[in-house]
């Protein structure tokens, strides 16, 4: 995610599935291959499933192009490109959030058009799933990042921006004063390009701090954590390695209640580095010995792909041996293992975990450039649940390595469990008290009459009950089905007990 980690507990997997049975399948979504851009999941049409927005550069023959594409999720592994209203950009980034509090996701974006014009602005989401310009203008940049986040705790989303302006690298915070008004905040942040700036509440005080990494005006690698003091940001010397062509992702890999920091990029002497720093409860950071591939010019995202209650790592970029994309399984106690997922190796890449097929596990959206200047944009379906439900001979049968990436694979329609419940989680100031807390939102057990009926009803009631839902830092919407009502009720209670043990407040979305 991104930037966030997912509170994902698939309690329906109460048995062990061998690593050889875990696989990701290229669904052959026929998306335009792009690089040097950004790819994110977003539910633009608000129908309860994840659509995809991907922006970047591509070549077709000798013709160069720049696109920002919206793909509508038609379900059953089918996506259709639709009109979005977004400008075509590359060398950019975008962030999803409801800046105007109207209950519809908007997009903040930066980048460069095909004619070299740089821009940084917000496009407002509409009820029909398209986007419209707002006239909001930030310092135009390319080769950077943009992130929504409520740094001042006033209930609306502010903006953190980094990148290369015409005057050089910048890093800026814009305060949201509502009514389409954003005001630049005096922060004295180091300007960077070819890197990223992220909101990161490392000290758990409820106010997002800032981590910035990238190349400074002289091209030197830079990394710094800035503590949110309420009236400004102050440098915090955390000992994080200086990097450029870099990326950062936070997630609680050790399940101790604070967010740890992963950084990747190019250090001094052109050395490629990927490091995981353990957050020692806001009192400092400890470097770990996690065995991740060293990369630059890529991305990383934390997510619990195997549903065992801890976050795993998706990472992609340029290694010393060429483009790579890997999934590392979190084996706890600080140990990770390469899943050997056989995903396409990419650099100048972007992507994110997300459950596009709503089957309760995390799938992968990824775009970038492979060896030989080949542009790709793929969706990989997580078949962990399918493998777990199959017999050992089926799950580990005669499929070759290439079989699971066959773009012509016929995907069966999602099954219809007899009894189902759905749930999601969030860390937020739900009641506008000034204090954030962890919440679990869970439905009753029902017997759906058609596919996705539960998810659709749940989403509708959740938005009606909690209007700020679209701006909340959410976990995935998960669904669990059981053949009998008794089993489903037992599974639901197990989920509630697990989250309650982690001090989540349980909120029932009933109908």
How would you label these PLM feature ranges?
Residues 8-16:
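Bacterial N-terminal signal peptides
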Residues 57-62, 112-116, 164-168, 215-219, ...:
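Short glycine/acidic-enriched loop and turn motifs that connect beta-strands
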Residues 442-446, 472-486:
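A short, exposed loop/beta-hairpin motif centered on an aromatic-Gly-Thr core
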Residues 48-54, 103-105, 155-161, 206-208, ...:
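Glycine-aliphatic tripeptides that mark coil-to-beta-strand junctions in extracellular
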Residues 483-500:
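A short, charged, amphipathic alpha-helix used as a generic interaction element across diverse proteins
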Residues 37-46, 92-101, 143-151, 195-204, ...:
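Beta-propeller blade termini
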Residues 352-354, 362-388:
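Blade-level signature of beta-propeller repeat domains, shared across WD40, Kelch, NHL, RCC1
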């Amino acid at each position: 995610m991104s930037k966030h980690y997912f509170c994902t507990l698939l309690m329906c997997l109460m048995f062990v599935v061998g690593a050889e049975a875990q696989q990701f399948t290229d669904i052959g979504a026929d998306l335009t291959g792009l690089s040097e851009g950004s790819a994110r999941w977003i539910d633009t049409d608000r129908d309860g499933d994840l659509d995809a927005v991907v922006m970047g550069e591509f070549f077709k023959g000798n013709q160069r192009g720049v696109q920002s594409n919206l793909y509508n999720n038609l379900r059953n592994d089918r996506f259709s490109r639709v009109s979005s209203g977004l400008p075509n950009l590359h060398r950019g980034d975008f962030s999803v959030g409801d800046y105007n509090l109207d209950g519809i996701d908007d997009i903040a974006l930066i980048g460069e058009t095909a004619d070299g014009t740089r821009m940084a602005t917000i496009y407002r989401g509409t009820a029909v799933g398209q986007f419209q310009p707002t006239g909001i203008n930030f310092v135009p940049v390319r080769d950077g990042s943009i992130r929504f986040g409520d740094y001042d705790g006033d209930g609306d989303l502010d903006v953190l921006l980094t990148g290369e302006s015409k005057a050089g690298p910048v890093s800026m915070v814009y305060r949201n004063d509502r009514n389409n008004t954003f005001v630049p905040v005096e922060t004295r942040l180091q300007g960077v390009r070819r890197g990223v700036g992220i909101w990161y509440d490392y000290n758990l005080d409820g106010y997002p701090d800032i981590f910035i990494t990238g190349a400074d005006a002289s091209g030197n690698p830079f990394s710094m954590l800035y503590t949110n003091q309420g009236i400004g940001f102050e440098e915090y010397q955390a000992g994080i390695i200086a990097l450029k062509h870099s990326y950062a992702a936070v997630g609680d890999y050790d399940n101790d209640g604070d967010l740890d920091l992963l950084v990747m990029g190019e250090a001094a002497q052109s050395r490629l580095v990927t490091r995981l720093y353990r957050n020692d409860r806001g009192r400092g950071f400890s470097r770990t010995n996690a065995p991740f591939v060293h990369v630059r010019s890529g991305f990383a995202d934390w997510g619990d792909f195997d549903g065992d209650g801890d976050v795993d790592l998706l990472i992609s970029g340029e290694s010393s041996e060429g483009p790579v994309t890997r999934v590392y399984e979190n084996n706890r106690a600080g140990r990770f293992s390469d899943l050997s997922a056989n995903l396409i190796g990419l650099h100048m890449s972007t992507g994110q975990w997300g459950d596009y097929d709503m089957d309760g596990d995390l799938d992968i959206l990824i775009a970038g450039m492979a060896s030989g200047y080949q542009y790709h944009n793929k969706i990989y379906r997580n078949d962990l649940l399918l493998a777990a439900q199959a017999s050992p001979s089926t799950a580990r049968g005669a499929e070759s390595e290439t079989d699971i990436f066959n773009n012509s694979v016929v995907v069966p329609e999602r099954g219809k469990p007899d009894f189902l419940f759905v749930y999601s989680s969030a860390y937020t100031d739900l009641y506008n008290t000034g204090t954030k807390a962890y919440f679990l939102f869970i439905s009753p057990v029902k017997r759906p009459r058609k596919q996705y009926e539960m998810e659709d009803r749940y989403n509708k009631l959740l938005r009606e009950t909690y209007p700020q839902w679209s701006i909340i830092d959410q976990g995935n919407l998960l669904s669990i089905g059981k053949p009998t009502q008794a089993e489903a009720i037992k599974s639901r209670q197990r989920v509630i007990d697990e989250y309650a043990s982690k001090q989540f407040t349980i909120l029932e979305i009933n109908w």
